[in-house]
Swiss-Prot record:
Protein name: ATP synthase subunit delta
InterPro entries: ATP_synth_OSCP/delta_N_sf, ATPase_OSCP/d_CS, ATPase_OSCP/dsu
Family label: Belongs to the ATPase delta chain family.
Species whose genome carries this gene: Francisella tularensis subsp. mediasiatica (strain FSC147)
Subunit structure: F-type ATPases have 2 components, F(1) - the catalytic core - and F(0) - the membrane proton channel. F(1) has five subunits: alpha(3), beta(3), gamma(1), delta(1), epsilon(1). F(0) has three main subunits: a(1), b(2) and c(10-14). The alpha and beta chains form an alternating ring which encloses part of the gamma chain. F(1) is attached to F(0) by a central stalk formed by the gamma and epsilon chains, while a peripheral stalk is formed by the delta and b chains.
First-listed, main subcellular location of the protein, grouped into a coarse class: membrane
Length: 174
């Protein structure tokens, strides 16, 4: 976990707990994504990180447009001078929400694009293996030669040709 992730996690967790408790998950998810996109804009990031304007002043300017609770959340982040990590807070909020909804992300790396039926079959197999709904993110990397590398959380399933060749190489060299 990166330093930014460690800093963002308590904010994301607090936001999730509040939003979940008050049935506001969708609303807060959208608000966090919106502010995340705003902060990613270079001109907004420049204003937020400006030494002449405090982050609290930036958030105060938005007070009338925001729900009181979300404003208070942003004010806390601004008070701690952490507005620039808003994209990470939003990402972690979404990760916590997926875990809460029993959804896990599977990063699937393939050597080349493949048939939808094969991907559906892989998704079904992963859902059975992990006992949850799988949200697959497909990446193409010709370097794996063939097969697939699947990462779900801390679990890595390497059934790629390059992975098998590496294992064979290490066996032969030992």
């Amino acid at each position: 976990m990166t330093n930014i992730s460690v800093i963002a996690k308590p904010y994301a967790k607090a936001a999730f707990e509040f939003a979940n408790e008050h049935n506001l998950l969708q609303q807060w998810s959208k608000l966090l994504q919106t502010f995340s996109e705003l902060i990613k804009d270079k001109s907004v990031a420049a204003i937020v990180s400006s030494p002449t304007i405090s982050q609290i002043e930036v958030v105060d300017a938005l007070k009338k447009q925001l729900d009181e609770n979300f404003f208070n959340f942003l004010a806390l982040i601004a008070e701690n001078k952490k507005m620039l990590i808003m994209p990470e807070i939003a990402d972690q909020f979404e990760s916590i929400k997926k875990i809460h909804n029993n959804v896990r992300v599977a990063d699937v790396t393939l050597a080349y694009a493949t048939d939808k039926n094969i991907l559906d079959s892989l998704k079904t197999s992963l859902e059975k293996k992990f006992g949850c709904t799988i949200d697959m993110h497909i990446n193409i990397d010709p370097a794996i030669i063939g097969g697939a590398v699947v990462k779900v959380g801390d679990t890595v399933i390497d059934s790629s040709v390059s992975g098998h060749l590496e294992k064979l190489k290490s066996i032969l060299l030992s």
